[in-house]
């Protein structure tokens, strides 16, 4: 659905540009890897911080650049749009193992030429045992080796990738320009007492910052020269004028402050792009775009330098350019990040720091531009609050109707107080933005990696608890073991064993994350990212060393609903009503419900026990009780930046499992809720597939019983409706009322919608050529349906239509 009558259509050239980008096959790109290798080889005598700065300098000064015929913005990540650069300093392991498999994947396919394969093989020897993954794995203690061997903790994203889940200080960048950062760095460097041992690392850091600022300026000047060269050859007068203006802008920003809307957009794009050339961490987000860009928009509109149509076309160009950024993941990593997502989040709406509605004219323009482009990037989030502009809320619902899973809605009424309770200043709490999927942070002030990556698998752990601490799938011991299910005379015994085991597993997850974070801090400091995050320059530390103002990490879990439903079935059918014996249930699980008698047990588990998502306290409270040990335990453990400067340095809970419910399900045996072995688990805090039978209000009530004020890392809720359900204005108003109740009264944290019919999805599986730009909401992000694996497609189809 396009609804051009409501939102208007892309300009002809932006429509053509969009199609060109969508038609690009994603290829593996070796250029960055070659340049990075050369830089590392040339600077082996340098401290790692300086070596990383010189690496970025080498890349930005030598990488291929181009300006597309239809673009209004300059800047590219790779030799072609949608190509995925390689980051060998993180790992070459999966790249070499999968060189001949990238094109054969059943999802997240990448293409690769024989020349590229050889180029990557040529540089590989230098990186053997000389990258983050190698050093991280060597650093890990034996105590957690079993979890890495079995893939229980999903650390692929941390060992293979860089800085992620943050937004730099775009308002300050636009106001001061990088020249302002340069001046502050020079002043800090000049003020150091070099007899103080603490000044040694600071000296190196400040010099590295100056290197990358100059490198960014050089990069922009290369585009300025290219735009001028293209202008000289351009026959069309209007396009020649555009190229000359682009040349002028690139000669100015981001080094100098932006003074117009066009300059501000180009400056932001350069930084957003270069951060993802420096490092391949995903979820590099734009922050509160409508707030920091509005002064430039307003001034240009008032002066007559800009029309609304000009701004709209420029933003659609920005979003198309945003889609060109790509990332190659290992096959294992794609199981938790299906659809090649980059999670580049744009946040609009919300409140000002003086607690007024923050919606402005640019908020509407951003909505319209995203509606016109209908792409998977950027990830659009709207901050909801009880006084949100009603017309703006109406427009949000209209965008949802388009069926590409945006915008997601975050609730100020729960998130802001939660941040304040954790020690975030009130002013900063009111300025939060979405980072990546559902995670939130204060843009420009938040530390490295605001989300955990270990994905504690609740249903798999429950089976482990029932098996005296031994994992059913691998046969390995995960936790100490507190008895077998057959010997547990009461439900309280099972819950006591669950409590102790979950705390133990939580501790193991922290060990893994801290050791890998320390390896990342030592091996791959990212200098530009640090420089653009407050207060790294003031402290003389990288973001991974504790340079940010705040630093909190949220833990992640998978299968919350399966856990609750499993406990519900065990309590009711085994212990309370004694319709199934402990031995019968355990044997049925081991049999995967295959025999006729075990199929009957499966039927009872599915049909005769309360299910999460139906506003039934019997099961909802079990979910809350079983989750409580994790919430309590995770906050006990500091992260590697604790007491090194930032406010916080600790952990809290979060439920964003992205698409790990599919990958983690592949390693999980049959569960007591009646789920078959190796099928997907429930995602986020959403009910299990087809378990919610009483409509969306009941789902909202079940989800809201979770202690959302303590799950500050995000409470991700996916919902699905058919397009027909929102066809009438009356039904759209009903949805608005439902969301208001969820947020205002029930204190829900987040909700997002897939507005697509089951029939459309099934037809897209059968006839993918007819649905090349069909977009679905996977978890806290949207993806093109056709690039997803069959397992993930089936998982999305199976989600209940409300």
Regions of interest found by a model, annotated:
Residues 230-240:
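A conserved hydrophobic secondary-structure block that centers on an alpha-helix together
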Residues 228-229, 297:
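Extended, structured, electrostatic nucleic-acid-contact surfaces
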Residues 207-218:
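Extended non-globular scaffold/tether segments
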